[in-house]
Amino acid sequence: MNYLKLKGDKMLEDKKAVVFAGDYAYIRQIETAMKSLCRHNSHVKVYVLNQDIPQEWFSRLRLYVQEIGGDLIDCKLIGQQFQMNWSNKLPHINHMTFARYFIPDFVTEDKVLYLDSDLVVTGDLTSLFEVDLGENYLAAARSCFGAGVGFNAGVLLIDNKKWKSNNIRQQLVELTEKEHENVGEGDQSILNILFQNSYYQLEDTYNFQIGFDAGAAEKNHAFVFEIPLTPLPKILHYISPDKPWKQFSVGRLREEWWKYSFMEWSYIVSSWKEKGVWYSPNIYEAKLTCMNLTNSWCVEKIDYLVEQLPEIHFYIAAHTYMSDELKRLSKYQNVTLYPNSFPILVEKLLQSSDIYLDLNLDQKLVYVYDLVKKYNK
């Protein structure tokens, strides 16, 4: 069997853009959803909007996703422009649910699929990506099979080009500032208000809200349990607090979530390889290491250097907490940050680095120059 072994720009062609959002506390759910997506869909460019997920997670999973023709992008929502301190009346949903507002800030593709992390994909989503949005801003399935209000925002096929040209991000932020205390379902309510007359309704199979089982039983919506589950819907969404990863839950298809949670990435990659889909991943290897000790957020041209020199690894240390300007650098795989470090650890780091970069404009820490001379850096 002939395998596709492409590198560089060719690996980046014809990818379907998919976005997840969450924090490190939800990492198992994010990865489970990602594994289910990649088990049935190759050539996906996955963006993960986050504030605190470690680089190592991205570095390892990126290799697997690249092997099936995709890519994994670390999108750090760090800074005042990404503040999401709005109130939310649903205790099982945290502030990162509002992160989807910022999709246009990070995603380059014209069409993008947003997926909540409390779901699993059970099949090929090509037909979903091929949905014609027409003049609509997004496509979404009805909430709770029609028993809820409007659409469920856990699966959104978004016209990202239209969102960018109409500054939807800012419209959502302003509407949330105004209404967040008056709505019952957080950002889902806000999205429904803004797009109530400009969304395309998806078939339930693309957002089958199996997590509504408990609510349907409580409200005596018997019709929900008559909907066929064979074949499985394309996306199973475990809405509500009745989650399958908890010790106990009452909803159906709990086992489907666990199947993907325990599924090995090596199995996913080998399954695609058997179908003739395999790409050589871009394995990161630093050719040179450099170190900087800073006592200020201002490290001259560091963003530019990091982007222009991807084969050089930058170690940036500080004796204090780091500012947002520096923490944002953690999205690059060729940067390692050491906030709140100690002099003896700084010395060890400098000793193991190839060169020292003196990029600080002010508040220089003089003792480091003695170390530079000592170790001939």
What does each model-found stretch correspond to?
Residues 63-105:
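Active-site-proximal specificity loops/subdomain of glycosyltransferases
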Residues 324-340:
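Nucleotide-activated donor-binding/catalytic signature segment of Leloir-type glycosyltransferases, i.e.
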Residues 112:
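Short aromatic/hydrophobic "clamp" motif used to bind/position activated sugar donors
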Residues 48, 282-328:
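Conserved catalytic-core segment of nucleotide-activated headgroup transferases in glycan assembly
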